[in-house]
């Protein structure tokens, strides 16, 4: 049993990139689907596909690598808010990720979005993870 599904999601992506895998399969949930959509919109992954099976479904993610250096597009995935220590932030108090080069994924009352989107909509929330 996984006690922190978001940490498991990030770890599966991190481990697949360290092993230079092109594809990673992750058990699906609505929150993970939204995080995957954000990663695709921001250009951190090549493509993704949701597959339904008899249980909860799968998310298949095609990871993105630099063509010349073969380095992954995602340099770091770190969990910020965790079950034992939740981290919340107001819209004007979001910390910049990698001096503005990365993104933070935030769960707000208006849905899951990046820190920049939350700041523009003037809504705070739980900071799930930082990606750069």
PLM ranges: what are they?
Residues 1-132:
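Core subunits and conserved enzymes of cellular information-processing
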């Amino acid at each position: 049993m996984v006690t922190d599904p978001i940490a498991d999601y990030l770890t599966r992506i991190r481990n697949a990139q360290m092993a230079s895998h092109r594809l990673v399969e992750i058990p699906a949930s609505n929150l993970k689907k939204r995080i995957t959509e954000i990663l695709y919109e921001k250009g951190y992954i090549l493509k993704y596909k949701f597959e339904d099976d008899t249980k909860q479904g799968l998310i298949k993610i095609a990871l993105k690598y630099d063509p010349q250096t073969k380095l992954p597009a995602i340099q770091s995935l770190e969990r910020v808010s965790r079950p034992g220590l939740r981290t919340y932030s107001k819209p004007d108090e979001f910390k910049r990720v990698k001096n503005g080069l990365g993104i933070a994924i935030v769960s707000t009352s208006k849905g899951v979005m990046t820190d920049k989107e939350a700041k523009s909509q003037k809504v705070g929330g739980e900071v799930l993870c930082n990606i750069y």
